[in-house]
Design a protein with these regions (language model features):
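Alpha-helical transmembrane segments and their immediate juxtamembrane cytosolic regions
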Residues: 2-421, 432-435
């Protein structure tokens, strides 16, 4: 039987799908290994906090800038397509926020349900509190990504009119925010949650416009080495923490430089990645990871909770962290999480289909922004306070309100058009199934 050819939209770059997909296993494995459980009664904590080699591994293994570069590529591609159809910025923000809000709401309910089962089975209350706080930490990406996505129409306009000035302004703001506390000013580092990731997202705009691929390969390599060199200056000369994970909260200029290094290295590797993506096995693997990307990212914490609960129920010990026994047991530990996650990938999409169909109506920009703020506020509360706090119910209610508002849309005219980026992704996934 002749295999049907893969239909790929003309504005889709499979090298972007590749890097987004391969980043997911890195995130899952890192979070799984970071989960330390120790003591009597047990407590959950960051197992790698005292493991010094991790700091230098993160110079290569910290892939969050690549996520935002890929997100910037996808965001400006979607927004430009929407503009050509005559859609509004409010509708773009509505669709993108809804595509984040629905999955994260269900995943948060999944975490709470698992924790409730563990509590009913007699798990220690303080262990559950520390464990629940650790499970909430990956939510930072959802909150920040929702904010950055809502800025895409504005940042795309600035990119079109004054791209260079936009890059330099964002970079200058990042440096200023870093320097103010160092000179006795107020602690304003939280502002870099916006400035750093907007800058890195903007790098994805440059990838979309083929800025970097037009440069000589020797120049790209030189720029990547220079970015890493400036990181060394910041660490050894200015006292920055060499651990890129430590530089996440709040983000610092080191992540900006790492984003630059990664965009140059990605551009160098793009021809090889595109050649790899012409192979059917690679398309199958990347298509599967892309198809279940949101499930993998959001539900790997549920998978960890299920594995921990099963380990406690079976009376299996938790070895002291960083010991030889602990490192050896990380292999079955990670494999168990992957197995549960694979099962969740088969179940969760079916559950997600219970959502009512959204009304295709144009949403005014102020309403779309307000709904996005509600989403970020709800996720942000659980992120900073943990799942097991009195405010969790209110936070989930806030997210549910945002979902209802985004689903209904606004008082504008009916639209016959389909959702934007997700249409492309779902078609690509369907094509992957036919390979």
């Amino acid at each position: 039987m002749t295999r049907s050819p893969l239909r790929i939209p003309p504005d889709r770059d499979l090298s972007i799908d590749f890097v987004r997909a391969i980043c997911l296993p890195v995130v899952v494995v890192l979070h799984a290994i970071q989960m330390g459980i120790e003591g009597d009664p047990p407590r959950a904590f960051n197992a790698l906090a005292e493991w010094t080699p991790l700091a230098w591994i993160t110079w290569i293994g910290m892939i969050m800038p690549t996520f935002f570069i890929a997100g910037g590529f996808a965001g400006i591609t979607t927004w430009r397509r929407l503009e050509k159809r005559g859609e509004t910025a409010g509708e773009y923000i509505r669709v993108r926020a809804l595509r984040l809000a629905r999955p994260v709401f269900l995943a948060m309910l999944g975490v709470l349900l698992t924790l409730a089962v563990m509590a009913l089975c007699g798990a220690d209350a303080e262990f559950l509190r520390t464990f629940a706080f650790r499970l909430a930490e990956p939510l930072w990406f959802i909150a920040v990504y929702a904010i950055c996505t809502s800025f895409v129409p504005l940042m795309a306009a600035l990119h079109r009119r004054a791209a260079g000035a936009t890059y330099f302004t964002l970079a200058a703001l990042v440096v200023i925010v870093d320097l103010v506390p160092r000179f006795g000013g107020p602690p304003i580092g939280a502002l870099n949650w916006l400035f750093v990731w907007l800058f890195v997202q903007q790098l994805g705009f440059g990838v979309r416009d083929q800025w970097y691929s037009r440069r000589p390969r020797w120049l790209l390599l030189l720029l990547a080495v220079s970015a890493y060199g400036l990181m060394c200056v910041a660490v050894f000369g200015l006292g920055y923490d060499p651990d890129m994970i430590a530089n996440l909260n709040p983000p610092t200029v080191l992540l900006l430089l790492l984003g630059l290094a990664q965009v140059y290295l990605f551009t160098l590797l793009q021809p090889a990645i595109r050649a790899l993506m012409r192979l059917r096995p690679a398309l199958l693997v990347i298509g599967a990871l892309g198809m279940y990307g949101m499930v993998i990212y959001l539900w790997h914490t549920v998978a960890m909770a299920i594995v921990v609960g099963a380990q406690q129920a079976l009376g299996l010990p938790f070895p002291p962290v960083l010991t030889p026994t602990w490192w050896i047991t990380r292999i079955p530990w990670v494999l168990a999480i992957i197995a549960v996650l694979a099962l969740l990938c088969a179940i969760v999409p079916r559950i997600e289909r219970i959502w009512p169909r959204e009304r295709p109506r144009t949403m005014p920009l102020p309403a779309a922004i307000t709904a996005t703020v509600l989403l970020v506020a709800g996720v942000g509360w659980v992120l900073t306070q943990g799942y097991l706090t009195p405010g969790t119910a209110a936070a989930l209610g806030t997210i549910a309100l945002a979902i209802a508002w985004l689903t209904v849309g606004g008082p504008g005219p009916n639209r016959a058009s389909e959702p934007l980026e997700e249409v492309t992704e779902s078609r690509n996934s369907s094509d992957a199934r036919r390979l």
